[in-house]
C-alpha cells in the first residue's frame, strides 16, 4: 500500500482544518442554550443529540490528513468520557483553542517542544488549582444540581440525586429504557463489582458496548474453568432451557472460553464470562455473597460439587445482568429476602467481632455492596429518537454525579477555567522564552468554553469573558438566565473531575499536534483503478 507524506507547516495546517471541522460540529452544543446536532445513521432513523462524544464518534473526514487531526481531537472527547463520563464538549473546545493558538506561534517561529512544555506545565497547575478549590459534595441537593446541569433537565437531576442518596456511595446506579412514557426510579436488590467481560465478542448492545442478559442463569465457580468436557454438559442444559448464562469464576480460559465466544458469535447460546473480583479468601467470601444474592450455590470441588456433574438447580438467577469492559451489575437476583438479610446480619456480627481495621474495612465494603442494592432509572419518552437522546442525557448525569461525589465540585459555566487562568501569571513569570509563551497560549484558551457558552446563548462571547474575568471566585455567567451572579447558589456547578480531565486531555493532544513535523497516510486506491471502474460500470449498463 503506497503512502502519502506531508511535512512541516503543510502537515500541521491540514490537521488543523480537521480539528476545526470536528470541534466546530461539537461546540454548538455547549451550554444550557446549546443547539442540537442531527446524525444520519446507516440504518434506522437519524439521532438528535447534544452529547459531544456521540457527535465526535460519528465524524470521519474524507481528506486523510485532515482526518488525522479530527481523530486526535476525537480521542480527547473519548478519553475524557472514559475517565469522567462527561465534559467531552468542553475538552474538545479547549483542545481546539490550544491548537489554534499554538500553531499560530509555531508558524511565527516559536519552538514547538518548548511551547508544548509550557502548555503541559500550565495544564498541571490549573488541574491542581481546580482540585484545591473544589467543594465536597455529600447532600442530595448538590448531587441533584450536578445532574441537572449535565442533563439540562430538573426532573432527571432530582431522580439521579434520589438514586445516589438511596444506594449510597458504594451503590450502583444503572439506566434502562422503559416501555412507558414516564421516567422513574426503582431501587432493587442487586450487586455490582469491578470486573468486566473476558471477551468483547460477548457484547450484545453495540451502541453502549455492554452485554445485557435478561432473565439470566448465573454459574458461580470457585476455580478456573478451562476444560470444555467439564463445562459442556451444563452448557447443553442451559441451551435447552433457552436462557442466557452469566459465568463468574476465578478465570475462564482455553477451550471453555473459545467455545463460549463461538456460541456468542453464532448466537446459539447467549453467555458472558467474567472473572471473580478480589483474591484468596476475599474472593471466596464474595462468591458466597453472590450465591446468596442470586439464590445459587458456588461450584466447589472441595465440597464435592464438580462442574461436570452439576445441573440447573445449582445455578442462581437474575432478572437482568449488565456487563461492560470494566464492571458487572446483577439486578434482582433470585435469592430470598430472608437469606440476604441473614447474610447481612452475619456480616454485621463479623464487623463487631473483628479487631483488625483492614478486615473491618473489607467486611464493611461487602456489607455496603449487599445492603446498597441497585438503583435503576427507567427512561421513557414518546418516540424512539427522543428516548435515545433522553437515555444519553440520563447516563451523562449519572456519570457527572458520581464524579462529583468522588472529587467535589467547582463553579460551572466555564467560569472556573477563566478564574483558574488568572492564577497562571506566577507560573508565567517563572518561565522564559517559548515555555512562557506556551503558558500564555494555554491561558488564552481557558476562556474558550465560556466564550462558546455565551455565543450559543446569543451574546457576544468576548464581552462575557471579559466581565467574568473581573468577577470574584464563585461568581460567573449563568447562560440559562442570562445573568451574572453566584453560580454555586444558582446550582451552576461542574464536577471537578470532569473539568480537570478536560484540561489535562486537551493539553496532551494539543501538544502532540503542535510537535508534529510529518504526517503519513495511506494513498487512496480509487486513482489506480479508475479505468477498470468505468469498464465495470459500462458492463453493468449492458447487463440491464
Curated annotation (Swiss-Prot):
Positions of ATP binding: 29-32, 86-90, 413, 478-480, 494
GO molecular function: ATP binding; ATP-dependent protein folding chaperone; isomerase activity; unfolded protein binding
Bias kind Basic residues: ranges: 534-544
Catalysed reactions, semicolon-separated: ATP + H2O + a folded polypeptide = ADP + phosphate + an unfolded polypeptide
KW Ion transport (keyword) present: no
Keywords for the protein's UniProt record, in alphabetical order: ATP-binding, Chaperone, Cytoplasm, Isomerase, Nucleotide-binding
Chain intervals for the UniProt region annotation (Disordered): 519-544
GO biological process entries: protein refolding
Protein name (database record): Chaperonin GroEL 1
Source organism of this protein record: Mycolicibacterium vanbaalenii (strain DSM 7251 / JCM 13017 / BCRC 16820 / KCTC 9966 / NRRL B-24157 / PYR-1)
